[in-house]
Amino acid sequence: MWKEFKKFAMRGNVIDLAVAVVLGAAFTAIVNSLVNDIFMPLLGIIIGGIDFSSLKASILGVDVLYGNFIQQIVSFFLIAIALFLIVKVINRLQREKEVEEAAIPTPTKEEQLLTEIRDLLKDRSL
């Protein structure tokens, strides 16, 4: 059983998944910082510094924290926008790389043969 587990754990896709989870956690910190440290203060300036999280209603002596719910919705949309922008930049960089790779024309069969003939003739003349 130990050998089977070891074989399973050492397979490439399990290790790839573990790396993805760790990178995802690190990326979460980046996105949260972008939202909390950049977007939220800017949004606060736009909406006049309103903090939704303190809004609540008392119903039969129970506090309903609907403001926190609103705050989480705003955070969700800001995180979604941040992720969209990050993915858009990454996609643009990948497209630019693909364009660069596509810009290098691959020689046709004729060009390859002519190059080989040229190289052979050059070697004979030496």
Curated annotation (Swiss-Prot):
InterPro entries associated with the record: Mechanosensitive_channel_CS, MS_channel, MSC/AndL, MscL_channel
Molecular function GO labels: mechanosensitive monoatomic ion channel activity
Cited PROSITE patterns: MSCL
One Gene Ontology term, aspect cellular component: plasma membrane
UniProt keyword list: Cell membrane, Ion channel, Ion transport, Membrane, Transmembrane, Transmembrane helix, Transport
Spans through the membrane: 8-28, 70-90
SUPFAM superfamilies found in the cross-reference section: Gated mechanosensitive channel
Membrane topology: Multi-pass membrane protein
Localization: Cell membrane
Keyword field contains Transmembrane helix: yes
Keyword Acetylation: no
Family to which this protein belongs: Belongs to the MscL family.
Subunit structure: Homopentamer.
Classification via HAMAP family: MscL (MF_00115)
Function in brief: Channel that opens in response to stretch forces in the membrane lipid bilayer. May participate in the regulation of osmotic pressure changes within the cell.
Protein name, per record: Large-conductance mechanosensitive channel
Lineage, highest ranks first: Bacteria, Bacillati, Bacillota, Bacilli, Bacillales
